[in-house]
Structures are given as C-alpha cells and as structure tokens.
Amino acid sequence: VGLRFDTRESDSRWIDTVWTCTSEQVAEMTSVATACWGLVFHERDGQAYAGITGPETKTGTAPVPEDASFVGIEFAVGTSLRPVPPSLLVDGGVELEADRGAFRLDGVQWATPSPDDAEALVERLVRAGVLIRDPLVAHIRLGHCPEVTARTVERRFRAATGLAQGAVRQIERARAAARLLAGGLPVAGVVSRLEYFDEPHLARALRRYVGRTARQLGAGAGGAIGLDLNHPSTS
C-alpha cells in the first residue's frame, strides 16, 4: 500500500537517476523539492501517459493515479531540453502526447523506454539535438573553479537549470538529510554530516523542501512521499 520505488544510478553523464514506481491504494503524496527535471511515463487502465516534470523549489501535495506503474528519468543538473527553457519548467511541467509504446517530443515520435533502456533513449535525444548541456555547469558540479567571473557562472547556471546555485545546494542537502534520517541516522549526526548550523536549521529545511519532520522520517510516518528514501544518499 502506498508508493513503491526502485531507483538506480546511471553511467550516462546526462542522467542523474532512473526510477520505477507503483502506486497502490494511494490518491495523493507529499511532493519533495528537486533540482532535476525529468521525463515520466506511466500506464493506468491500459492508457499511456507521458510528461516533463520540472525542478521543484518547495514541498507540496500532488495527486497520484491509483494502481499505476511509472518509469522516470531524472536528468543531471545542467542538462536541459533545447525546445523548452529550464526556467519555464520550474515548479511546473508539460504533458506530452502519448500512446502505447510511444510519446511525442519536439515534433518527433519516440519509443517509450523501459527502465533498462533509458540510456538508449537519452542517447537518441542527444544525437537529435533535443538534449543539451552547459559544460561550464558540469565543470562546476565536479568541484572545479572555472576561469570566468562569479556573475558569469551564476548567469549560466540559472540559464541551464532555472535555479540559482544556492537553491540547488539547499534542495540537494535537504533530500540527502531526509534519506539519512529515514535510514536511522540521529538528528545530531545529520546536522554534523551535512553541515547544518543546528537542529532548528535542519528542521526548517525539512519543512520547506521535504514536508516531513525528522521524527516522521525516522518513523516512516506521514503517508506517501515522492522520494525513494531507500536510495542511498551520496552526501
């Protein structure tokens, strides 16, 4: 009962994660802030659906189709769709035309991927010029210092992601905190590991970005949540 996730990493530099999810006897979930945009595909009652999900800057409540099976591709920060400026996707999304086995993007029909061939779809999108990425953002994400001004870095980061660098760091840290708490790490340990100022600072971040308290995350309480809490944190 609820949402059952399975998430894996990808060896593609364009992809953050690939995930599947099934919903059972759940009508809504707590959505969790994310710095990534994605492609999501699901089927319900024999009908296929596809959509683009944008980065989310805060938590909220979202409807969930009952008894549906989802496949999702979360793209690496700095990857974007050439036809859709990232800023237009923030806290939003786009529904795509879909049929059994195919969906339409940028005027072209593409085969709907399974979890195992997400990378093949992404490579086709890259070759077609539908997916693009800013190498400067990728450079920054690896911890390198670019030889341009801070203003140029921020401008290009926003253009590539729709978000400020600081917002991305806060969102990613809160998601990591949620997973650590769900995995049993004490609050004090999370504060120390992720360099929050103190426990109230962590509590505010969880409230804003995750929609759960530390106690709820530790106890697995609060209902369905749009985050695979069993997926290990990289922080």
State where each predicted segment sits.
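Alpha-helical bundle regulatory/interaction domains
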Residues: 1-150, 160-165, 179-182, 186-200, ...
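Base-recognition residues in the alpha-helical recognition helix of bacterial helix-turn-helix
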Residues: 152-155, 204
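DNA major-groove recognition helix of helix-turn-helix
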Residues: 157, 169, 206-207, 218
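Pre-recognition alpha-helix immediately N-terminal to the DNA-recognition helix
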Residues: 173-176
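Short, basic/aromatic recognition patches that contact phosphate-bearing ligands
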Residues: 210
